Amino acid sequence: MELMINADRCADISRLSLDGKNLSYTSVVGNVAPDYFSIDSDGFGFLKSFNCGFITTCGFDNIGNPNEDEGTLYGLHGNVGNIPAEYIYHTEDATSIEVHAIIKDHAIFGKKFTLHRTYVISKTENTFALHDKIVNEGSAPSPLMYMYHMNIGYPLLTENSEFYINSYEVVPRDEEAKKGLAQWNQMIPPTPNFAEQCFYHHYHTDLAKMMVYNKDIEKGIQICFDTKEFPQNLQWKMMGERDYVLGLEPCTADLDGRHTIKKNSEILTLEPAESKDFSVNVHLFNDKSQW
């Protein structure tokens, strides 16, 4: 197992592989330095910096659609994934390597969130865990929106990939997704002019499991998270030419944007000095019997 942690981009994982076989997705934009990030006037500047990688962290102000709230434009998926780690180091023992990072999203007269990030990477198995603690270091309550945008790419992702989620209900996000609801778990070859399809998954259990396996390369991945930490989970099915990716996205709210979430439901808010923990566990495997 090999993974690349990008200190300049929120200590996210920009590449993940097993036995030299790529499992993650690298978009056409490549690795973009945080200096070049801008939300742009339409709020979609994120897409010009969206390398995808295995995981892109999204938030803290917004996840999902760009929108305006109380006179401020919040861009697609927020900006935390484009903030460099202020401090990063590693420790290790006989069984694991731990990578620790601190990422600060602070502003004068604004929010002051600090992300304490820890990866625990096994030396004996093809597994790792990501643990995050977000702390409100400001003196006022601050809304928090958070998402792990995890991305599966070629050669793990092909028309021969098998895909499983232990959800009890699959809900299309929009009219385009309704067209593909019956095939939500079926992958197809890269297709010209394919329009993305997004599906929400709902669970009866606290432990969500998502798995992808491809017999052609005899590689698979299992991703687990706590549905109490992430009450929503979106599947992004994008089968386009050059934009060929399966996104698995545990999140704290629907992806309709900050203003809509505040209007329709109670948005997660951290009081001064309050913290919130999030985590995800990843297991890579060669044998489908481990499915």
Indicate residue ranges for each PLM-predicted region.
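Surface-exposed acidic/polar loop and edge beta-strand patches at domain peripheries
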Residues: 1-129, 141-143, 151-189, 201-291
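A short beta-loop-beta micro-motif enriched in histidine and acidic residues
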Residues: 147
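A general structural motif
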Residues: 191-193
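C-terminal beta-strand-rich structural cap/linker in extracellular carbohydrate-active enzymes
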Residues: 195-197
